Amino acid sequence: MQAINPIWAEVQKSLQKTLSKPSFETWIRPAKFNCFENGLLTLIAPNTFSSDWLRKNYCETIEKTAKEICGYDVKVIFKSETNINSYLTNKENLDEKKVDHKTKSFSNNSQDISSKNRSKKPNGLNLRYVFKRFVVGPNSRLAHAAALAVAESPGREFNPLFICGGVGLGKTHLMQAIGHYRVEIDPEAKVKYVSTETFTNDVISGIRRDGMTAIRDKYRNVDLILIDDIQFLEGKEYTQEEFFHTFNALHESGSQIVIASDRPPNQLSGIQERLISRFSMGMTADIQPPDLETRTAILQKKAEQERMNLPRDLIQFIAGRFTSNIRELEGAFTRAVAFASITGLPMTVQSIAPMLDPNSVGVVVTPKQVINKVSDFFKVSTDELISSSRRKPVSQARQIGMYLMRQGTDLSLPRIGDEFGGKDHTTVMYAIEQVEKKLSIDPNIASQVQKIRDLLQIDSRKNL
C-alpha cells in the first residue's frame, strides 16, 4: 500500500492549482511518497523516464512549494519504481539461486554466493540484454531456443552457436542474454563479450608491444566467449590466424563459443575456409525481421517496462509503419514518447503520426549526408566533427551525428566509428545512449535532432 505523507499531499494540492492539468496529471500525481527525513523528501516516479523528467523540470518547483509549506528548506530526490522493482526482482532471483546452489552443494555459504554475484560484473555485458526482455516471435524462435539451450548447457552439442541476421534484429541481445544467464547460475563463470573490432585491436596491440601471451590468456582463459560482428574479420589475415587458434583452444577445453554475424557462414567472404568450416560445425540459427504481431508485442513490452500507457491504436500504428528492424521500431517509440512529453500533446495517432515518418532517416541516407548535414546545422567543419576535439559544441554535434547515423543507415557501431575518424565502437555506443537519454529530458536536443531529420528527409527524397 502506498505510503501517505501530509506534507507531500499538501505539495500536490498546491501544485494542482499552479500547474496545467496535463502537466499535473502526467508528472506530479503519479509520483509516490517514499520518505521524508531531515529535510530530504524522496519521491518515486513510475519509471526512469518520468524520474529524469521530474528531476529536470519540476525539482525546483517542488522544493520551493515544500519550503512554503514546511517553513524551512527542503531537498527533493527522485527514484525510479522500475529500477527499484528490477533490483528487488534480481535480489529475489539471486536468493532463489542461492538456495538451489546450497541444495546442490555448490557452496555452504549462501552469503558468499550473494556477495560474489553482486560484486562480479560480467565483462562487456549490457544489463538490459537479458532473456526476459527478449520478445520471441516466429522470426526468432529457433535462435532464442538455441541460445537458451546453450545458456543452460554450455559447451555441448551447440558449440559453436552461430547467430546470424540483419542489423537491429536482436543478435547482440540474445548473445548477451546467454552471458547474463550463465553468471546468474554460476557466479564463478568466466564470461567475455567482445566485438570483432575489439579483438582485432587487442591483437594489433599485442603484436606492437610483444604481448601476445597476455592477449591469448585474456581470450582463451574463459568458460564462455561471445564474439559479435564476426564478418569484420574479412581481409584481416593475421587476426584470422590468431582467432583460428583461439577458437581451437576454447573448443578443445570445452568452453562455449557464441558468434554473431550479419550473414550465415557460407556467405562470409574474405575469411579463411578453415574458419568458415569451424563456424559451421555447431548450430547456425538466423533471425528474420519481425512480423506485425511480433512488432506489436515488442512495443507493448517496452511500454510495460517503461510504465508508459500508450493507446493500442498508436502501438499498432507504429508497428505497422516501422518494419525493417527492432532498433528502428524502438527508436520510433522513444521519439513518440519524447515528442508527446515535450509538446504536451496527447499520445494519439493524430498527434504523433506527423513526426513518425519512417522515411525521415532511411537507408537511402548515406554516412556522408549525415556528417554534412550535422556539420552544416551546428556550424562546425566536417574535419572538426570527426576529430577528437572535446569542445562541448563539437562533442555534442558528434554524438547527435552518431545517433542519426545509427538510426538512418545499416552501419554497425564499429563502421560508424570509422566514419567519425576511427572512434571505438564503445564511444559510439556511449554517444547513442547519451542522445537517447537527452531526447527524453531536453526539448532543445529533441528539436535539433528533429530538424536534422527533416533536412535528411529532404535529401532522401531527392535521391528517390
Curated annotation (Swiss-Prot):
Per the UniProt record, the lineage of the source organism begins with:
Bacteria, Bacillati, Cyanobacteriota, Cyanophyceae, Synechococcales
Q: Which domain of life is it from?
A: Bacteria
Q: Which keywords label this protein?
A: ATP-binding, Cytoplasm, DNA replication, DNA-binding, Lipid-binding, Nucleotide-binding
Q: Where is this region: Domain IV, binds dsDNA?
A: 341-464
Q: How does it assemble?
A: Oligomerizes as a right-handed, spiral filament on DNA at oriC.
The compartments listed are:
Cytoplasm
The main place the protein resides is: cytoplasm
Where is region (Domain III, AAA+ region) located? Answer: 124-340
Which portions of the sequence form the region Disordered?
99-120
The protein's name in its UniProt record? Chromosomal replication initiator protein DnaA
- Protein family: Belongs to the DnaA family.
Does the UniProt entry include the keyword Nucleus?
A: no
- Gene3D superfamilies assigned to the protein according to its UniProt record, in alphabetical order: 1.10.1750.10, 1.10.8.60, 3.30.300.180, P-loop containing nucleotide triphosphate hydrolases
